[in-house]
């Protein structure tokens, strides 16, 4: 049976529903890029989906078999019409080194500018759920992410939620007390030039978790973006455009609150009832 679908093979082709056989091991970059496709059913539990494999296609739904443990590279589903997504079980892939965790943004699913995406469902008993920077940028209907109580650790990258940018998740909801939460980048700011303390940023509007949970403890000690400058918004992959150029401080790590007028505020948190 077929094992590989090579780069650009079905680019700009027309399909309705596709079933990918259990023999398939690899869908390479842009294999279905820009295609007119409705639904994909994956039979293999270990198929790898390459970067931009379904980029800017009309994909509405993709179904994985129970226990799917393949690797989905970044931007595989960028600008598709997906409405929901079941996050794979990555425990084995991380333990076996199939995902290089030394990268700044490891290979985990991202959904930039998936404007119809409303829900992402995470599996139980995950040792790590890693949300890359810009993974949910430009997803206005995805208002929150909910993590099961059995989740051990969540790393949340820069997704730019602010009072003047609400096209990424507004809330992170933790159902358990023992889930650890960490910022997913080196982004921080200094209150003034002589401040030696790093003020870590998690770019979300609010953290919801049980009282005395690890997530609430983290929420009490991190900051969030209050308002982005035009320069920052210019970097949001076309979500905003202007003539002032792009500000790179937020990506660079050391972010002086005064340098580009970016403003921050303490993280809002709420106890889960």
Residue ranges of predicted features:
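Leucine-rich repeat
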Residues: 109-111, 197-198
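Short, aromatic/basic amphipathic alpha-helical patches
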Residues: 185-193, 197-198, 215-226
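Surface-exposed intrinsically disordered loops and tails
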Residues: 97-104, 190-199, 236-238, 253-256, ...
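C-terminal capping region of solenoid repeat domains
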Residues: 221-273
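Structural signature of tandem-repeat unit edges
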Residues: 1-4, 13-26, 35-48, 57-71, ...
């Amino acid at each position: 049976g077929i094992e590989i679908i090579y780069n650009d093979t079905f680019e700009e082709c027309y399909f309705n529903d596709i079933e990918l056989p259990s023999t398939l091991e690899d869908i390479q970059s842009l294999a279905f890029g820009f295609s007119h496709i409705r639904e994909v059913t994956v039979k293999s539990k270990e198929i790898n989906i390459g970067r931009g494999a379904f980029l800017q296609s009309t994909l509405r739904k993709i179904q994985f078999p129970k226990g799917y443990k393949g690797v989905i590279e970044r931007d595989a589903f960028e600008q598709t019409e997906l409405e929901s997504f079941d996050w794979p079980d990555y425990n084995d892939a991380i333990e076996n080194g199939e995902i290089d965790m030394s990268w700044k943004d490891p290979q985990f699913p991202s959904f930039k500018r998936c404007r119809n995406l409303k829900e992402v469902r995470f599996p139980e008993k995950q040792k790590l759920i890693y949300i890359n920077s810009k993974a949910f940028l430009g997803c206005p209907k995805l208002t929150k992410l909910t993590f099961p109580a059995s989740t051990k650790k969540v790393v949340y990258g820069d997704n730019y939620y602010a009072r003047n940018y609400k096209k990424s998740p507004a809330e992170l909801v933790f159902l358990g007390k023992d889930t650890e939460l960490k910022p997913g980048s080196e982004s921080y700011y200094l209150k003034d030039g002589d401040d030696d303390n790093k003020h870590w940023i998690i770019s979300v509007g609010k953290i919801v978790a049980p009282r005395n949970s690890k997530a609430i403890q983290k929420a009490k000690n991190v900051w969030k973006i209050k308002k982005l400058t035009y320069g920052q918004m210019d970097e949001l992959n076309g979500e905003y455009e202007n003539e002032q150029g792009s500000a790179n401080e937020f990506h660079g790590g050391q972010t002086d609150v005064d340098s580009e007028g970016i403003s921050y505020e303490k993280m809002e948190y709420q106890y889960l009832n």
